[in-house]
């Protein structure tokens, strides 16, 4: 091969590898600079990488996060971090006692109200303060002055889950 052919081949390889990396930018694993010495990221590093994934969709739509290759505890840690980050809520924030349930359930086990708006997973009778709640939580929710609810969906371990939060009394 002539030097020109080698240069062209190398350039094509670089372009191909770059294109593949762009296509894989949605993977939940952190970039190499966030990984530990052995190539394994800590929980915090994985969470940082996951939360840095851009997403412009509405909170009630599916954000596809593939965590199937992660250990279950790491994946659940990331999920909790994502919820807290996205809704700007923690257990000691404006709405205390937040809890998160999987599988499409809303509210606590003592909450016997039925889900009567499956399209948005909101309780229509609670929409009077929805604007205030959206400003507080930056997400879809339904709330009164003392109570807020909402949800989003993720794909974890190949299963679509509706993650809901409920706070207040």
UniProtKB/Swiss-Prot annotation:
<comment type="function">
    <text>Involved in the unfolded protein response (UPR), a transcriptional response which up-regulates genes that enable cells to cope with misfolded, endoplasmic reticulum-retained proteins. UPR is part of the endoplasmic reticulum quality control (ERQC) which prevents the exit of misfolded secretory and membrane proteins from the endoplasmic reticulum.</text>
</comment>
<dbReference type="GO" id="GO:0005783">
    <property type="term" value="C:endoplasmic reticulum"/>
</dbReference>
<dbReference type="GO" id="GO:0030968">
    <property type="term" value="P:endoplasmic reticulum unfolded protein response"/>
</dbReference>
<keyword id="KW-0834">Unfolded protein response</keyword>
<protein>
    <recommendedName>
        <fullName>Unfolded protein response-inducible protein 1</fullName>
    </recommendedName>
</protein>
